[in-house]
């Protein structure tokens, strides 16, 4: 997207005050903006795609009012729509019926907090009015029926299911409708045209013109027939067909080749194709055809499908009619034959001219969004149809007099369908909660996978590619790398979903070359009819275009210079084409798209730091994104802060009421990061409605703050930052600049077993008192205890199988009581490689009437927090896709320093920039330096004429905003670098070329060349070395191959693969190689003997035969090959399964069990 040159006059700039008004958020922190373009529209609520869809489903009052204001007469919610569809349910004779109406929800049973704490679902009871009518007697019985507990969406757009927060992702699917396509016949190179009628549910209907110029039809993907057979089956005579299609030689030729005479024969012909092997009759054939396309129960285009069909074919069938009509079929055929004949227009039934053209299935006019509400509605429809069957059966079996709606309805299938959807559907996902942007992006995600969507394997390049119709609807940048690229996207900043499920984007109306503030939302196919200018086209104060020719887009994304009078619309904002995460990348316009993609994705992986710091260089989106993420506390009404503590803020409202806001303290998020609230108001402060009163994770003063502003030098340093490695100053470790808190949850339960109940206790066999020192009298660790791997968190014993007791043992048992009973230590221990401090304990037990799963008597959860300082191996990244791993942490005194003695914090390599074409990071570096130092513009230089008054004199440490495609220009940065405020000595450390003279911290000598120095925003990513580093001593082995398992999760070993073996061979390290392949791996006997030899201090014995060799022999024998092993003298060696006696003897002597067999893991199968 082009950016207008700096010397052009653009729309009026915005001041700080007007910006606070424009954002509509009181108490917004100061951020001076380089934006030149006035935006007539505020960013909408970013969670509307989730919240409004669920409101539609439940028929919420707010949704109802909104729709009435938009002019809809009698809006019907999604739940009511399904109940209306299924009602009335009649019995087989039609003498009784049951109908549902007026769905309503009661109050939710428990708060969100309680649900998360006790593993419950945040749900409300759903009631409907059920009416049973006996048609024979006219008797009506009406009852309110409970349909089950229904999961309810929280204010943050999430669901709490079994105690975990989940998000239902919107699905991107092909819209129902009629689609024309053109292919090239392989044999004759002729263009062949076809059309598909795709319903929301029901059989497909396909027509095509083949290479022999005959028109055919395929019903429900069965064999092809001449299209005239279908027309005759619908009751058309040969004469009527001739008359209707007299203009088409193709269709008349098809009619000549069709030998069916009359409707009956045509019906039987269709029946034979659809039901081969069944005896055809006229009645069954007629019923079959009617059921396929003309019965609402079996076939439904849905409102959106009917809307698309009407629009494509110029029909005016009522939108409620979801079945096909005769007129539809005839018009579809006419359109197809005209398309084949090469015509470009046709007159529709309502006497309008419609274009004749093929459809692009990847166009956003033909792809729609199934939002949360619709996905749940489809699931309810499945559950209700199962209930319908039950109701029918009960109507016939129960006594008519005794029937009430309650006795007919079985609610179990509805509950099961909902549970299945929220628990196991591909679209109901565990919410991503690393930081606020991660959660916000997850809720705005568009997923083309899932039931009814595409599959990874089948999706080709076309469907993944960026399409012109994505502009302003789906972000062209933000998508995952890897197999899902292009299949998962993100909603653009201003986009919204209309009632049909199509994505709309806003435009400013242009009337006779003058831009107005009227906003129109257009769908992708409506937009194609208009010419749109970019948001940065220069306009005067009265809204007229300044230039004679304006850069604008036509259909298909073609860009050209156009007369202002020919322009219909103009973009609302330069960031309209990108998603929220992408809009948070400053200088995005200077970054290569591949790197911008990585930048947008890596922001979501940034872990919340101990102290958050907002970026010096932002884009102005930070405030809105943070508030809409729902992770901060926002005042509901204006008032005065009455009382303040770490975990409670009480506000006295202007109307005299009080409201207390609870703050989260050190909670665990779904991804183990720390969720903590911190008040940012004081007692006695006046606050306004909508003002942020407490920061959440990764926010500062209500703005998103994912990382830290660090002083960066861009230079190589002794090769330690080769290949994207990063060098850090030790100051960042000492001052906890990049320190984060991670919280792990450990859980254990005490169950009833066949041999008796398990017990949570401090009384653990064979464990010394010092190991139990931190456990309380119940056997649970105390809060505040420092723990490391292997430490006991909760003591638990499980009964062992008991044999018949001897008289002596019975005596002991009588004296010492239960203590002598055989029990096993099954305590909860800290997993391998983890350390930390116990910060919370939750105990649930049956005795306290807590709901627990069957067989569980007690459940204990322990929360362990870990403070992770930055260390070599951790991954850091900027916002431009510039990522790297810390290679070395240098003492502060060894870091390069500036002329005033300031050492830099971080050294990045210069080689990371040119090849990757993410120059945005260098511009950010310069603007970051400017923001930290402040500047004063003297006089009225040429480069500063587009800067607003608030940018003339900026104090040191002021945060700046450079919005995407409308930010600071290169010449402005160059000019400002020469206008920075001097330091105490009156000097400027960084010259106007953005470089500083640096000195080597070790020798004090200056470096030969000046170096680019400035402040860059650096994020600490979730890929921490503590989670990755791993070492194995003895551990589990695979059952079959007897080789160690792989992977950290299984406490596995490192795979010594084929190429590693070659390396050993190349160096002639024969003994090392033999050890690796035998006693360190799968020589079962050898490894026990080696252990014995090491313990006794003897020489290590000769290795035996590895288990994998025996497995190989067995494999060959299973192929009926007689394989023998021969010694050096040619005699046959008998392969015993294992030297059991030796093995058992050695193991018994040592008191060890080395084999610890485990079932083979996925890794094992792969390796």
UniProtKB/Swiss-Prot annotation:
An example molecular function term from Gene Ontology annotations: DNA binding
Entry superkingdom: Bacteria
EC numbers: 2.7.7.6
Reaction equation(s) it catalyzes: RNA(n) + a ribonucleoside 5'-triphosphate = RNA(n+1) + diphosphate
UniProt GO cellular component terms: DNA-directed RNA polymerase complex
Family that this chain belongs to: Belongs to the RNA polymerase beta chain family.
HAMAP family, per database record: RNApol_bact_RpoB
Name of this chain's protein: DNA-directed RNA polymerase subunit beta
Gene: rpoB
